[in-house]
Amino acid sequence: MVFHRFEDYDKHYLTPDLSTGLAPVIEGTYMYYCLINKEAGTGSELHYHPNELLIFPIKGKINALVGKERRIVEPGMFVHVPAYARHSMKATEDGDLQYLYIKDQTWTVVGLAEDEAVPDKAMSVDEINKVHDSGVGRTRAEGKSEVIIEGLNNSFYPILNSLDDAPVSGRRTIRVEGERLAFTFTEVPPGDRDEIVNNPHEEFTYMLTGRMSANVDGETKEIGPGDIVEVPRGGARSLVAGNEAPVRHVTISSMPFLENVIDNKKD
């Protein structure tokens, strides 16, 4: 299936002992693609994980910490959390929160406490929820934490003032590349056509505003806000913008480093 909507998937607590985050999870080949939901005033404890994390809020405000830097993040700002970086994401008291949450598949979506060592094997969502519901709690691995707090530089990237910004006059793209995943914001004029015959990376595109005609390997759909388009490596896809402006979407792509790591695990 190449077309998705988050409401078609069951929600799960991803790390219930450390976070109130409830999310549907779409599992690709190289990444986990999720929509985190948090009630006003709730969020996560300080934690980390061995995989890279990309965040883009679509509703509400995040009281966000990455490393030592704290920001109030609203829709229109992208947050990059490098692998092993200490972080915390909490919904402000203003209202409930939703944000796109994408992790690479070198680890699961389950996080680790700030002072916890990295275990030999990551827990699955089902495993951490069973342990949490039992009241016993997880068994921590022996050793020192590998959390990174210092030297992370600026992880916050302004993309839009708000999701309601007026349309721009031309085609605009803003791209941020991490080690394993890349984030691309795109705004296109009506009628814009974007085609790739042999897609070099896995991609998930989330529609923010406007409408487009999408075709992935012969499967077609008219897409609008909240629709997700999954394109596998080597796939063919086209996106044609409709007449309703602005047409905006965000795309997460796998990077060569990640592809090499995951592909070598399969061998």
Predicted feature residues:
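Ligand-binding loop in jelly-roll beta-barrel domains
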Residues: 75-77, 83-110, 233-259
